[in-house]
Amino acid sequence: MTKNIHDQRILILDFGSQYTQLVARRVREIGVYCELWSWDVEEADIREFNPDGIILSGGPESVTEDNSPRAPQYVFDSGVPVLGVCYGMQTMAEQLGGKVAGSTEREFGYAQVKVSGESALFKDLELTQDVWMSHGDKVVEIPADFVKVGETDTCPYAAMANEEKKYYGVQFHPEVTHTKGGLQMLENFVLGVCGCERLWTSESIIEDAVARIKEQVGDDEVILGLSGGVDSSVVAMLVHRAIGDKLTCVFVDNGLLRLNEGQQVMDMFGDQFGLNIIKVDAEDRFLKALEGKSDPEEKRKTIGHVFVDVFDEESKKLKNAKWLAQGTIYPDVIESAASKTGKAHVIKSHHNVGGLPDDMEMGLVEPLRELFKDEVRKIGLELGLPYNMLYRHPFPGPGLGVRVLGEIKKEYCDLLRRADAIFIEELHAADLYNKVSQAFTVFLPVRSVGVMGDGRKYDWVVSLRAVETIDFMTAHWAHLPYDFLGKVSNRIINEVDGISRVVYDISGKPPATIEWE
């Protein structure tokens, strides 16, 4: 009998660490399904989920404080292996009879762990491990039946284990790339200790998603709002593989897209992949609604409302469509559930994840709702979507609506499109595009004096923006070569009539945000 990709699973309890989603992504990368739930989950929910192993994440709280988070007692009564990471190790130690104390020496950054004894967690690893620490408190006394399996110069219990019960704790973060052997440690736990198999692969995810879509919609028709972005594009390919021409995609051209993007979407999905796709040219409608609006939040809301109205009108023309496909991904689900209930594991379908009307009388098809963004990209490649589309830099939902500062006009959008295309083209030509995390151009609603030939010109200013980041929570401005910036500036000023000055944004995040609006 073929095993289902969800048959073996790891449960990750979230205590609030900034790295918790990274733990889940690493487990998926190993090839095992996992879910991320809030630490205060009910015992009945854990029983129903029936995990093969449980990971307790790090977190910002202190075990020494009253009312700080604790793992549900059932975690330790369930008989399944448990791995505590950072705060997770501390609460494990304290709950099982050990002691945790505050430390005058906060350990943050690289450290060397000396591995002692033999532990399944460190199988096939060197006895000295470079790891990433981020903690103030530390375990000062381990519970009975545990042994020390790792220490640093300042942390006597950097790792502990109860091999019989398959309980493990590490004070460092194996999920971050700074911990060189971290992925191997997680593999040792997930595959070795928990006994899971690598069932979670791009091929098996696609096979499972297609089967579930077929079962869910049967012979009904499905409608999808296709933006040309990663998520909706992968949904389009999955649903089309499942039901073929019973899928209709609606592509709304709002006039706020990148240069030639509308035609590229139609060429790729209509001509190349043979999907049913309706293009709605709504540029005038969007620009009319945006007249006189300069506040960024007001612009975002206006763009969202007009999109909903346009999509709603088109969906009503498709009388036989009973299902709405959406590109909801797992981080959306986690964030949405946590904000509504405080418990991130409560996974319910609701239109507002995608920002569509509450009164749409359609069922939801969300084939990506279990997937992280990196997984979506991988299955997109498997489905035949081009690499350069799947791995393009992020583009905001409101498009150029938040890259034209202040009021939006067609003239401004047209100038910005052409300037941005030159910047991106030159980044590719110089082999710099994939060396920065995000790059784009911003239109500034100010005029500046310039000289062209023998005459003076009084035209608009654009700013180039390029950043390097791992998680987009913080970012450094990219130190692009001066010669490169000079070339881009010259091309924009010479080739885009209406722009007289180009500047480069050297602000980090914080204090600035990556986007200007």
Curated annotation (Swiss-Prot):
ATP binds at residues 227-233. InterPro entries: Class_I_gatase-like (IPR029062), GATASE (IPR017926), GMP_synth_C (IPR001674), GMP_synth_GATase (IPR004739), GMP_synthase (IPR022955), GMPS_ATP_PPase_dom (IPR025777), NAD/GMP_synthase (IPR022310), Rossmann-like_a/b/a_fold (IPR014729). It catalyses: XMP + L-glutamine + ATP + H2O = GMP + L-glutamate + AMP + diphosphate + 2 H(+). Pathway: Purine metabolism; GMP biosynthesis; GMP from XMP (L-Gln route): step 1/1. Residues 200-392 form the GMPS ATP-PPase domain. SUPFAM superfamilies: Adenine nucleotide alpha hydrolases-like, Class I glutamine amidotransferase-like, GMP synthetase C-terminal dimerisation domain. Its EC number is 6.3.5.2. One of its GO terms (molecular function) is ATP binding. Residues 9-199 form the Glutamine amidotransferase type-1 domain. Catalyzes the synthesis of GMP from XMP. This is GMP synthase [glutamine-hydrolyzing]. It comes from Vibrio campbellii (strain ATCC BAA-1116). The gene is guaA.
